[in-house]
Amino acid sequence: MPRSFLVKKVKLDTFSSADLDSSYGRARSDLGVRLQDKGYLSDYVGPASVYDGDAEAALLKGPSPEPMYAAAVRGELGPAASGSAPPPTPRPELATAAGGYINGDAAVSEGYAADAFFITDGRSRRKAANANAAAAPSTASVAAPDSDAGGGGGPGTRGSGSGSASRGGTRVGAGTEARAGSGATGAGGRHACGECGKTYATSSNLSRHKQTHRSLDSQLARRCPTCGKVYVSMPAMAMHLLTHDLRHKCGVCGKAFSRPWLLQGHMRSHTGEKPFGCAHCGKAFADRSNLRAHMQTHSAFKHFQCKRCKKSFALKSYLNKHYESACFKGGASGPATPAPPQLSPVQA
């Protein structure tokens, strides 16, 4: 008998081999840290009866029967979040199917709720606050660029050619591009671009943005030494240069990547691993960015609105798809309903 048959196989202690209660008992401390650090809400926090004697790390093994937006309805997340109506959970039957567990196609190691991406994130609230401030600008914010940008005779002021921005009485030094005449601050102390109107929080971000308005014939444009492609934005050129240094190669298909984490994400296409799962509908994704884009479909914040039918979308790509397929084609056929009488003479 070969010697390999005499070797005793050791059964590893994994979540797949252990019972579910003990597995969640060992992992509850890690889950508790993720709940606190990443801002997860009450979707995974259950009553203390789940683990007897341990009320702090009491976690549910599936979706909570409480509504996903209970914290937002109670107003614990601020007035901006509590003022929006909570959207309905797309698939509530998942909470009761199979004993309360989400049945996905692949094993999901992390589950995310839409609240963790959007309601706890301040970007949506800041965007709404800036929109309100732009609709009704204060006199102080309007007078600030005039006092700094042109013509004043006081000390420390410059002509309109410099256009340096000021915020709160202090001068913010802008780059060479920002001093070209559009460094004035708009509503809320943000730096506005004089060509396209976009606003930025810092003058350095404005200077980086102004590189995109350069012409390809400009002296500041740079050419890639490998392929000869011309770039007017230096950050974009730096990202392009990485595409010529593909040192991380896939051992399965031979595809090469510039960074190791790109190769790691590519390997999931061979293994079928989808570790990022949606806590609302159970759909799993191989990449976190795809999950983040999917989460916007469950969000109450839909900022992209169709100009024709006033239907709103969470993603701009969804709005563009709506323009191409539904709204404008359907709208063109709608007003053209009296067109068949015009076609009848042609057909005759």
Swiss-Prot record:
SUPFAM superfamilies reported for this sequence: beta-beta-alpha zinc fingers (SSF57667)
UniProt-listed Gene3D superfamilies: Classic Zinc Finger (3.30.160.60)
Localization terms from the record: Nucleus
GO CC field: nuclear body; nucleus
Keywords, ordered alphabetically: DNA-binding, Metal-binding, Nucleus, Repeat, Repressor, Transcription, Transcription regulation, Zinc, Zinc-finger
Zn finger (C2H2-type) start-end: 191-213, 222-244, 248-270, 276-298, 304-327
GO BP terms in the entry: negative regulation of transcription by RNA polymerase II; regulation of neuron migration
Residue spans of biased composition, Low complexity class: 130-148, 163-182
Region span, Disordered: 130-190
Comp. bias regions, Gly residues: 149-162
GO molecular function: DNA-binding transcription repressor activity, RNA polymerase II-specific; RNA polymerase II transcription regulatory region sequence-specific DNA binding; zinc ion binding
Location of region: SNAG domain: 1-20
PANTHER family per UniProt: TRANSCRIPTIONAL REPRESSOR SCRATCH 1, ZINC FINGER PROTEIN
Homology family: Belongs to the snail C2H2-type zinc-finger protein family.
Quaternary assembly: Interacts (via SNAG domain) with LIMD1 (via LIM domains), WTIP (via LIM domains) and AJUBA (via LIM domains).
Summary of the function given for this chain in its UniProt record: Transcriptional repressor that binds E-box motif CAGGTG. Appears to function downstream of proneural bHLH proteins in promoting neural differentiation.
Notes on the domains: The N-terminal non zinc-finger region mediates the repressor activity.
The protein's name: Transcriptional repressor scratch 1
Organism: Mus musculus
Top-level taxonomy: Eukaryota, Metazoa, Chordata, Craniata, Vertebrata
